[in-house]
Regions:
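Short glycine/serine/threonine-biased micro-segments
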Residues: 31-33, 110, 127, 163
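Solvent-exposed loop/turn segments connecting transmembrane beta-strands
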Residues: 32-45, 85-87, 115-125, 150-159
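Cleavable N-terminal export/targeting peptides
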Residues: 1-27, 170-173
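C-terminal intrinsically disordered extensions
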Residues: 4, 75-79, 151-152, 156
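Gram-negative (and chloroplast) outer-membrane scaffold detector with strong preference
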Residues: 49-142
Length: 173
């Protein structure tokens, strides 16, 4: 009888550890990030992330980018030289394999592609980078992203920079 109770307790302990270990696997999040990119650019990204096994994830995103310049007439940045200099928008997908895991944080490569437009023609990008996530209460995550975009048919061949943002869980936990 004592051996049966020990086995039942062991089974309960193993089952509870399995439930805790997979608490954030297969979850979805909506994210918003903003960043500064070289040379004289800012971007904003709205994303939906689907997490798979072992913190790997697929991200579907919409991105907007603005590149500012000095106004040649007045010699400094104006509203027109900021907002109307060079703008792009794009939609894309990125695969994010987890490469580092710690307590309440993890890091992932970000590899993907996107398509979109500037104000005149079609533009495509190859996206690569590293994203580090910090897990807060209730599944909310803060992230820092080092990113590089290789443009196809765009004015900027390379865009590289840093973004920060937050992700909120959606659906049932």
């Amino acid at each position: 009888m004592n051996a049966i109770i020990k086995r039942m307790m062991l089974a309960i302990c193993l089952a509870s550890m399995t439930a805790v270990a997979s608490a954030q696997t297969y979850s979805n999040r909506i994210g918003l990030g903003v960043g500064a990119l070289y040379e004289r650019g800012f971007d904003a990204t709205l994303s939906v992330e689907h997490e798979t096994k072992n913190h790997n994830a697929w991200e579907y995103f919409i991105n907007g980018y603005v590149k500012y310049d000095k106004d040649e007439n007045v010699g400094h940045i104006t509203n027109d030289s900021f907002w109307k200099n060079y703008r792009t928008w794009g939609v894309g997908v990125a695969y994010k394999p987890c490469v580092f895991r710690g307590k309440n944080n993890y890091g992932a490569l970000r590899l993907g592609g996107s398509i979109g437009s500037d104000t005149h023609e079609f533009v495509g990008w190859v996206n690569a980078g590293y994203e580090h996530n910090f897990v807060l209460h209730h599944g909310i995550k803060l992230f820092v992203q080092a990113k590089t975009d290789l443009a196809i048919n765009g004015l900027d061949l390379f865009r590289t920079g840093v973004s920060i943002g937050v992700k909120f869980p959606v659906g049932k936990r």
